Amino acid sequence: MPTIQQLVRDGRYTKSFKTASPALDRCPQKRGVCTRVYTTTPKKPNSALRKVARVRLSNGIEVTAYIPGEGHNLQEHSIVLIRGGRVKDLPGVRYHIVRGSLDTSGVADRRNGRSKYGAKRPKEGAKK
């Protein structure tokens, strides 16, 4: 507990909060253009070909973003919307691409968790 004299001399200081997604500039999402779409492999215990894209954001920063879901229609020069959220087994990937917005299509034939993948509600007659 500081003395009054120490508070007068030094004052209180606020702890600075370091954001997990600095390229978003405190925005919930940002728009960007894909400069490269490719696959990469995850860290040690896992094995896969994860789909990622290099995206140049509207503020000029270039980031690597993960493309969630099965299958995608992205290619170079596609306009995408990115949100924060890292991929634990891909080092350096701190952003997700939002499916179903701008040039990104939703996941086809998705039935559960559709809102996270931009999939429309299936027609009632089209059951299995």
Curated annotation (Swiss-Prot):
UniProt keyword terms in alphabetical order: Methylation, Ribonucleoprotein, Ribosomal protein, RNA-binding, rRNA-binding, tRNA-binding
SUPFAM superfamilies, per database record: Nucleic acid-binding proteins
An example Gene Ontology biological process: translation
Region (Disordered): 101-128
PROSITE patterns: RIBOSOMAL_S12
Family note: Belongs to the universal ribosomal protein uS12 family.
Function: With S4 and S5 plays an important role in translational accuracy.
Record GO terms (molecular function): rRNA binding; structural constituent of ribosome; tRNA binding
Subunit note: Part of the 30S ribosomal subunit. Contacts proteins S8 and S17. May interact with IF1 in the 30S initiation complex.
Name by which UniProt lists this protein: Small ribosomal subunit protein uS12
3-methylthioaspartic acid carried by residues: 89
Gene Ontology CC entries for this record: small ribosomal subunit
